[in-house]
Amino acid sequence: MKSVFDFIVMPEGNRYSNEVNINGDKLIVNSSIENFKLINRKATVLTVPTAFTTPIQEGDEVIIHHNVFRRYYNHQGKEVDSSKTFGDNKYLCQYDQIYLYKRMVKWLPVGEHCFIIPIENNDEWSQEPEQKNKGIVKIGNKTLTSLGINEGDLVGFKSNREFEFIIDKQRLYCMQSNDILVKYEFKGNEKEYNPSWAKSS
């Protein structure tokens, strides 16, 4: 069975990432269905839509929007599944809800999506652990490459674009090509900032 316009996917593991591993011990970090940050966003593609073609293939591992697997409370206070639920741990997912797909061992972006890792804040007078609106391109795209912005480059981005994902135990910010404002030259003291909890996810 295939959907006409949607991918059919299943979560890799549970729908929520409620546990982290700390030194071999499991720690429960969430007990609420309302916390979208801990919804699992990693899925496996079971079928692709029949109405159009994309580079994504059946069996691919993908990173998707949190609303696909989300549970929520309806107007009666009852816990219900997402409207994307297809049954038997299967879910419908639109193409624009997919941000990355994995080909072999490399994550590839869908459309204009790109992923930025923040850098450490070197200001000794600041208590913020990372520099605001600045980071390193970890996963670029064709548009950025055509503009001379490549993976590994230091860039500045628009405010409030910190859409957080954990990809291969790194906390990255997902954004669009037009969220990237400037390419900086490295000064030599920049370091990627990845909080310790992300490495345990």
Report the location of each language-model feature.
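Acidic-enriched and Gly/Ser
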Residues: M1-S201
